[in-house]
UniProtKB/Swiss-Prot annotation:
Domain of life: Bacteria
Membrane topology: Multi-pass membrane protein
First-listed, main subcellular location of the protein, grouped into a coarse class: membrane
Pathway listed: Cofactor biosynthesis; adenosylcobalamin biosynthesis
Purpose: Part of the energy-coupling factor (ECF) transporter complex CbiMNOQ involved in cobalt import.
Organism listed in the record: Streptomyces coelicolor (strain ATCC BAA-471 / A3(2) / M145)
Key word Methyltransferase present: no
Protein name per its UniProtKB record: Cobalt transport protein CbiN
Record-linked Pfam families: CbiN (PF02553)
GO cellular component terms given for this protein: plasma membrane
Family to which the UniProt record says this protein belongs: Belongs to the CbiN family.
BP GO annotations: cobalamin biosynthetic process
Organism phylogeny: Bacteria, Bacillati, Actinomycetota, Actinomycetes, Kitasatosporales
Amino acid sequence: MSRNTRINALLLLAVAALAVLPLVLGLGDHKEEPFAGADAEAETAITEIEPDYEPWFSPLHEPPSGEVESALFALQAALGAGVLAYYFGLRRGRRQGEERASAASGAAAAPGDAPEGD
C-alpha cells in the first residue's frame, strides 16, 4: 500500500468518525432539536440574553419546510464542492501538462538522440 493510499484511507476514516461519533455517543440527546443549525442556536442565545430583542433583518426567502431548507443547503454544499473539485482538477491537469511538455522537450533536445553525420 503506497503512502498516498494510506493517507487517503486515514482521512476517510477520520471523516467517517466525525460523522458517526456524534450519533453513536448521543450528543445532543438532551435538546429538543439535537442537531440544530447555527442560526437557531444564535437565536436561542440572543433571546436568553435579551428577551425583547427585535431582529432588524428578515430573510428574502423563507423555505416552506425544514426539508426544503435542508435540500437547498445540500444543493449549495454540492455546488461548492463541485467548484472546488473543478478548480483543483484543472490545476492538477495544468501542472501535469507542463511536466509532460517539459519532459518531451527535454527528451527532444537530448544530445545523444541527434543523428551524427559522417
